[in-house]
């Protein structure tokens, strides 16, 4: 780790740079959804911290982003349904050699710039689209535009057999993108990570399918308590290429090519408990994927993911507490990769457990602590090392909302085990300072 004086100077520089951005524009503009609803970001996000959703934020998303006025309604233009989101910061890796690239450790740089189209289309339909110019370590070019988050919805309440039922449909670009709980694959803590810090070699396949697939599904929310969804995901090519814009499909290993339509299911139960709310749920997906995205033919590798999760929130104006837990196990059948030699075994497994909690003091600052453990079977050909990919990671994060449009974040990742090894694991520890600006 660099000397403490360097970190102090870095924090001072980060605050100073953000301060220059705040002074002339002080929250004169707000993100598109806030403009549409007339509410502050904290109405939908705990402490104003995107993407952690409040009960109202989950309701807003499930009802297809239709609360409030559309951009054009009542014969007049109401607001611009566009916004810009940017991040910049710096990462210090305990052993600079583990950064990607090593020279990037300690250097301030932009992380990404995102343009989003978000808002109500009709009384029953809404959209959330993001296109991002982001930095990817080791890629050529390192900076590139591409589709990011896509979620198009239609939803409407019905009375069925004396029960209130919200029925909806969704089209999105990744399993979990449509989910409203922060235990899901797409929106789990830590919500943000450094583009250059090292990470575990193994992760379940659905964690990496976003932007490679196009999904279509239907859901029902009964009495605002029981939620059930069934969706199917296919490769985002042909008429769905707009969902994978920017993906290097012609580059070996640049994408994941799935076979046919792959089922994803979600079932949750939630209830209000005074100022608190509780959710328990399960999620799963079965996926057939080709080992070579340039040759989508022949046999596939088969993945089955089954997970369970829970979340509890206690939210008041002054104090906000959230506790989350998730468990996911993936079983793998390398029907194609094993005969080709790109897998050392005919089958395998990965298990990920994520436990985390957060406290927010009003809408000003938040402190989060998480523990993520990944275990799995050894696979030298797949991971590039002979040991198991077992990794244990502690995450400590401090967030400060300078305004509802600007957030400062300091995140520390501490590894006690990294890709099967305890010795030297701390060399992958990292400190990540980041600033978020959304208008």
Please identify what each model-predicted range represents.
Residues 52-54, 80-93, 100-238, 259-275, ...:
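Outer membrane beta-barrel
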């Amino acid at each position: 780790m660099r000397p403490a004086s360097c970190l102090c100077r870095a924090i001072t520089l980060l605050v100073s740079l953000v301060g220059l951005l705040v002074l002339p524009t002080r929250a004169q503009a707000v993100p598109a959804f806030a403009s549409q609803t007339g509410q502050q970001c904290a109405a939908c996000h705990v402490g104003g911290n995107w993407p952690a959703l409040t009960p109202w934020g989950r309701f807003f998303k499930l009802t297809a982003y239709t609360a409030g006025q559309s951009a054009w309604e009542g014969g007049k233009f109401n607001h611009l349904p566009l916004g810009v989101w940017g991040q910049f910061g710096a990462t210090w890796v305990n052993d600079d050699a583990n950064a990607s690239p090593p020279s990037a450790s300690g250097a301030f740089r932009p992380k990404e710039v995102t343009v989003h189209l978000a808002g109500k289309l009709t009384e029953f339909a809404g959209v959330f689209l993001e296109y991002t110019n982001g930095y990817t370590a080791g890629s050529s070019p390192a900076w590139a535009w591409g589709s990011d988050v896509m979620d198009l919805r239609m939803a409407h309440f019905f009375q069925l057999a004396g029960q209130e039922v919200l029925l909806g449909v969704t089209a999105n670009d990744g399993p979990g993108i449509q989910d409203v709980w922060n235990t899901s694959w797409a929106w789990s803590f830590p919500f943000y990570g450094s583009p250059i810090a090292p990470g575990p070699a193994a992760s379940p396949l659905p964690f990496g399918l976003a932007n490679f697939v196009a999904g279509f599904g239907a859901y029902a929310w009964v009495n605002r308590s029981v939620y059930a969804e069934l969706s199917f995901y296919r490769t985002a090519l042909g008429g769905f290429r707009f969902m994978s814009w920017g993906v290097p499909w012609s580059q070996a290993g640049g994408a994941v090519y799935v076979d046919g339509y792959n089922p994803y299911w979600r079932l949750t139960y939630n209830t209000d408990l005074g100022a608190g709310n509780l959710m328990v749920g399960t999620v799963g997906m079965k996926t057939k994927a080709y080992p070579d995205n340039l040759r989508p033919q022949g046999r596939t590798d088969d993945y089955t993911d089954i997970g369970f999760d829970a979340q509890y929130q206690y939210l008041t104006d002054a104090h906000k507490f959230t506790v989350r837990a998730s468990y996911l196990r993936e079983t793998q059948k390398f029907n194609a990769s094993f005969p080709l030699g790109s897998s050392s075994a005919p089958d395998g497994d990965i298990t990920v457990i994520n436990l985390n909690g957060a406290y927010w003091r009003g809408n000003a600052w938040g402190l989060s602590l998480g523990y993520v453990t990944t275990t799995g079977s050894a696979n030298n050909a797949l991971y590039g090392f002979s040991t198991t990919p077992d990794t244990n990671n502690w995450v400590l994060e401090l967030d400060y909302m300078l305004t509802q449009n600007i957030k400062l974040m300091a995140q520390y990742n501490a590894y006690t085990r990294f890709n099967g090894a305890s010795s030297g694991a701390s060399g992958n520890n990292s400190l990540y300072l980041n600033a978020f600006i959304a208008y």
